[in-house]
Amino acid sequence: MAGKKVLIVYAHQEPRSFNGSLKNVAVDELSRQGCTVTVSDLYAMNFEPRATKKDITGALSNPEVFHYGVETHEAYKQRSLASDITDEQKKVQEADLVIFQFPLYWFSVPAILKGWMDRVLCQGFAFDIPGFYDSGLLQGKLALLSVTTGGTAEMYTKTGVNGDFRYFLWPLQHGTLHFCGFKVLAPQISFAPEIASEEERKGMVAAWSQRLQTIWKEEPIPCTAHWYFRQ
């Protein structure tokens, strides 16, 4: 939709990967719609995933005992966070939709993306106490996980060896994104592209492109435990 701003947080080492193809088609389709699309290519940026004292450029509020959450909250208020953090926060703040494109690592995100979440979504910027879930500081924004897996779709069912895929979405979609106030759109799951045929992979890319054509008309998922753990 013309005038909308989209941030794609991309976490894959190889530009020619299937994840890279999904990222590229998202950029192309959303740009075609007139959206302004920004990509944070975390590996290409050599993004620092570790949460350390270096994230605070000013004086610590308690130099005797370091508490990362407390210190980054204070640093956010004092405008003394490291520039790589504030650069990403500005991108998030300007975005109407944030898409996270990544391969599933151990039922979660790659370490570099976890580090992005740990460092960028700090108290004062993404949430406060009070000021979380429906009152999160990023309310009014949309978020979407676009994930590739190593396992097949059958493996991620209630009766499959891995269990229902929605179980693994709970800490990411609910405990992180919804906690920060995002309205979460249904995830885009591309199952087992490594073992899929070329035709099947093309179908996955086409399905993602087609979905993006009407992405602004989608309703967010219900932010309830039942959506994830329904019986």
UniProtKB/Swiss-Prot annotation:
Zinc keyword on record: yes
Specify which residues bind substrate according to the UniProt entry for this protein.
F127, D128, I129
Q: SUPFAM superfamilies of this UniProt entry?
A: Flavoproteins (SSF52218)
Enumerate the residues binding Zn(2+).
H174, H178, C223
First-level EC class: oxidoreductase
Q: How does it assemble?
A: Homodimer.
The family line of this record is: Belongs to the NAD(P)H dehydrogenase (quinone) family.
- Name-wise, this protein is Ribosyldihydronicotinamide dehydrogenase [quinone]
Organism of this sequence: Pongo abelii (Sumatran orangutan)
Starting at the broadest rank, the lineage of the source organism is:
Eukaryota, Metazoa, Chordata, Craniata, Vertebrata
Annotated gene: NQO2
